Amino acid sequence: MFWKGPVFTKTGFKGQGVSLESCEIIETLDGEEDGVIVPLFRNCHTHLGDSLARKELPKKLSLTELVGPSGWKHKWLAENDLKSSIIHGLKEVISSGTGLVMDFREGGEAGLQLFDDLEYPGTVILLGRPEGNKLLPRENAGISSIIDVENSKEIARLARERNGLVGIHHSEGCRENIEPLIDLCPDFVVHMCHASDNDFEKIKDAGISVVVCPRSNAYFGNRAPLEKMISLGLDIGFGTDNGMLCSANMIDEIRFIRKEFGDLSLHTILSIACFGLDDMFNKDRTSTYSNLEQSGWILLSRAEENEYESVFNPKSEVLGVRWRN
C-alpha cells in the first residue's frame, strides 16, 4: 500500500509517494495522485486540560487575570472534568495529523495520571508541575515561570537526574530578566514575545530552544519576534498553547502564522511545524525524531497546483494519517 503525491522533507518536496508499510519515500510511482504528503506535525506546547473552557471563556481578561496563579483558568480547572477536556483537545490533535504533543500538566501526579489510559496513536511528552510537597511528579518539568516558582532550580535538577526535559514560560506578557533563565538553562523556553535582541543572543549561546505560540500570543495582543529567532538560527518549535484560547489543530496554527508573519517563506513555516525542536531532540542520538522515515505522514487533499500553497489553503483537508512506526 502507498500514497502517491509530492512528499515534504527538510529540503523541500521530493519523490512521488510514501510506503504505508515502511513509511519510506518512493521515488517513482504509477497511477493518479492521492494528494500532498507531509510529515506528522509537532505541537511543542499545549495545555489540553482547559480545552473545554473555550466555550465559557470570559472576555477582556488580562493575561494575569486569565492564566496567572490565581487566575480564572485555575478556578475553572478546579471545578470541571479535566479528563473530558483533555479528550476534547486530543481529538483536535488527532484530526490535524499531529504526531507529537508536549503538554504542560497542572495538578502534580494526579494531573499526569489523567493521560495514562487515553488512546492517542502519537507521542505525548508530559511536563509536570509541583503539587504539595512533591516538586517533580515524574521525569519532565513544565515550569510556569521563574517568578512564580521559587524552587525552579531544584525542579530542574531533579528532571535532569531523571533524564527528563525542562521547559519554562518566559517574557510572555512583558520582558523578564534573562539571567535567571540562563542560569536555570532549561531545554526549551516558551513565548519570548518581549525578549530583547541580547536575550536571544544569550539563548542561542546557551543552546536553549524556543517554542512560539502565535495564535495564543495574538489573543493578548502579543507577537513573538519569530523573524529574529529564525535569522539567528535558533532551534524553534510551534505550539497551540491553552486549549481554552485556541484549537490544538496545528494546521490552523500554521495558516495563522502565514497571515501574521507574511515575510516568512512557506517552506520555513512548514519545516518548523513538522521538524520543530529538532536540535533539542537530536541531542539524544537514539531519538526516533532524527529519522524521517519513522516520523509518520499526513495525506492532504490537493487544493492548488503549488504544493506549499496547497497545504496552506483552507480548502485542503486531511484525507489520512499514517502514524509513527
Residue ranges and their predicted role:
Residues 84-86, 266-277, 289-293:
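Short, well-structured alpha-helical segments that form the helix of a local strand-helix-strand
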Residues 6, 19, 23, 34, ...:
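Divalent metal-coordination and catalytic microenvironments
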